[in-house]
A protein has these predicted regions:
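Phosphate-/nucleic-acid-contacting segments
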Residues: 155, 166-234
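Short aromatic/basic micro-patch
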Residues: 53, 80, 112, 184, ...
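ATP/adenylate-binding site constellation spanning eukaryotic-like Ser/Thr protein kinases
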Residues: 22, 58, 83, 107, ...
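A generic structural signal for short hydrophobic patches within well-formed alpha-helices
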Residues: 25, 118-119, 229
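Cyclic nucleotide-binding regulatory domains
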Residues: 16, 41-106
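Hydrophobic residues on short alpha-helical segments
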Residues: 160-164
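Cyclic-nucleotide recognition modules
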Residues: 77-137, 141
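Cyclic nucleotide-binding regulatory module and flanking cytosolic helices
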Residues: 1-42, 68, 91-92
């Protein structure tokens, strides 16, 4: 079995890990192990005990939540995490239960630092709590932006904005101006992510397609004109 260190080139493409000092980054990898998930396999559910810190190095993980009784539960897809995203830091900080569900959307490989290991190491090296806090505060900023958009922007702008964010890796990549052309996401997933109906999602995507900004295919959205898509967000 390959050691976690083989995925260092992937992790180094992420802004947070790339800017960690060596005396934090190297012990993290030394404490890590690889975790492989099949499509649809659940990593953890809301209410589960903390299990550590994770980084996606292959595949993708959806972070979601549900409300209501089982027979009428409503689901919300918060985000789809792809390489080189890290997650799980909240429970490292407060030692409390998981706040949402995490599930692989395709065959996935994770770098996993078990909870007890990272807790003990940070207690012995408290100066590095600040580095981990930067991972959490960056996500908090993004969450505030998403809340503002949900309250103020109409659905077409919200959808375009989310596509731009996904194309740019939610700002997590190290390379300035880096983006990707194809976003692997279904219309159903996109509608759950934005809390709009599947029909509305389809109508907005068709409009963007007619303006030659995107091309919609089964399970993916191809960005044809990123600058034009940014213009829709304004």
């Amino acid at each position: 079995m390959s050691p976690p260190s083989v995925y260092l080139p992937v992790l180094q493409t992420g802004r947070w890990f790339a800017h960690l000092p060596p005396d934090f980054a190297q012990p993290l990898i030394a404490m890590a192990q690889l975790r492989h998930l099949a499509t649809g396999e659940v990593l953890f559910r809301r209410g589960d005990a903390p299990c550590g810190l994770y980084a996606v190095v292959r595949g993708a993980v959806s972070i979601s939540g549900t409300r209501g009784r089982a027979d009428e539960a409503r689901a919300a897809l918060l985000i789809r995490l792809e390489p080189p995203h890290w997650f799980g830091e909240i429970s490292v900080f407060d030692n409390s239960a998981r706040t949402h569900d995490a599930q692989a959307t395709e065959p996935t490989t994770l770098v996993h630092i078990p909870h007890e290991r990272v807790q003990h190491w940070l207690q012995a090296h408290p100066q590095h709590w600040h580095g981990l806090a930067l991972l959490m505060t960056d996500k908090l900023r993004s969450a505030f932006v998403a809340m503002e958009e949900l309250a103020l922007l109409p659905a077409p702008q919200r959808l375009a904005r989310r596509l731009v964010m996904m194309a740019e890796g939610y700002g997590q990549w190290t390379a300035e101006g880096q983006s990707r052309r194809v976003i692997e996401i279904s219309q159903e997933q996109l509608s759950l992510m934005l809390a709009i109906s599947r029909q509305t999602t389809n109508q907005i995507l068709k409009d963007l397609e007619s303006r030659q900004l995107v091309r919609v295919q089964r399970g993916e959205v191809e960005i044809l004109d990123l600058a034009g898509l940014r213009g829709v967000c304004a």
